Amino acid sequence: MTDPLQQVLRLNAIDRVALAVLLERFGLQLTLTAPEEVIPGSYWGDSEAGLKGQRLYARLDTPVHSVLHEASHFVCMSPERRAGLDRDAGGSDLEEAAVCYLQVLLAEQLPQVGRERLFADMDAWGYSFRCGSTRGWFEQDAQDARQWLRQHGVLDAEGVVSGALAGADG
């Protein structure tokens, strides 16, 4: 039987230029580390993405959902937390929900990823939601996350990613 964790989409299987361009919209630089090298700023270790300052670190074996999750933390955190960022993104439970919601929206902007693939990968990795699945949560129970993203300027009134960082002026 195949291990579902081994089946998640990894960075080596997507257009990394498209990913870097997406991250640059938010002032975040994708920095690849060598295979088997410890990923700087990684909270969870192993192949999980890391944040340090305005850099998002990853290896080619890093899961795409991990990169998008950490990028979403960067977008959602306050300017003060962003300024001192090194490994621990912090934030409230509601902000964490907003991060999960945003990572799905960002996945839709990457040609080889998309919402459906991210739902499957988040479920396989063990993300846990009240509705039992990422899709169920996103479609039925994420009103608070959407509202948080709108209130902080990350989504516009139509629910589209604005390109702004939370707490950014203007």
Label the model's feature ranges.
Residues 41, 75-105:
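Post-HEXXH active-site segment of zinc metalloproteases
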Residues 110-170:
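Long, well-structured alpha-helical subdomains associated
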Residues 18, 102, 117:
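Short Gly/charged-rich anion-binding patches and loops
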Residues 56-64, 91, 95:
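Secondary-structure capping and boundary motifs in well-ordered enzyme cores
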